[in-house]
Amino acid sequence: PSILSADFCNLERDLKAIANADLVHVDVMDHHFVPNLTLGEPIVGRICQVTDLPVDVHLMIEDPDRWAPEYAKLGAASISFHMGATHAPVRLARQLREMGCKACFAVRPAEPVEPIFDILDEFDMVLIMTVEPGFGGQKFLNNQMAKVRRLRDEITRRGLKTRIQVDGGVSPKTAHIVAEAGADVLVAGSAVYGAENPAQAIDDIRTKAEAAFKA
């Protein structure tokens, strides 16, 4: 789940509430690359220390070439960055992988996915945004599923192991749509932390996605 929808004054409590999840998704925003400001290295470092879950960091910041390795040093298991922000995406991806961190590429709704096909084998995962980046709780953009399908077809055609992550508007109502399109990593924020029982919401999303995988 995305902690963007968690209570930042009770973050350790809210991390424990999602102990049944597969990962913790942390959105780092600098108020320059996107119009919001969230958290930075000190808090991400503490999150890595207090949770047993893999920490998946999404950098919505300028100059990830400089900052991404710092988050890898803090213990991030995977780091996503944007093409429009990096000067050398392949070099950065290789650097992160050499540090034992998975390299991930993030694609915003208005951006096509095809330009990254040539360097797809350099990345462990591609993050397809299904809301405009910057704020949680937005409406799911169903038109992005065509992008997910094209990406899945390319990954399958080339026999790659690159995973597809979808973030934005994911809920028990949309999980099957995302999974059917070909995504295998689902990030939910408000659907989890806005639920009366976050752990149950995670199970519901997982069940819906797994059913779609098997269909």
Where are the language model's segments positioned?
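Short acidic loop-to-helix transition motifs that present clustered carboxylates
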Residues: 110-112, 171
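Acidic, divalent-metal-coordinating active-site segment for phosphoryl/phosphodiester hydrolysis
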Residues: 169-181
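Conserved N-terminal beta1-alpha1 strand-loop-helix module at the mouth
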Residues: 1-80, 85-88, 103, 116-123, ...
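Generic enzyme active-site microenvironment
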Residues: 25, 165-166
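Anion (oxyanion) recognition and catalysis
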Residues: 97
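Conserved beta-strand segments that form the floor/walls of ligand-binding pockets within enzyme
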Residues: 106, 127-130, 165, 186-187
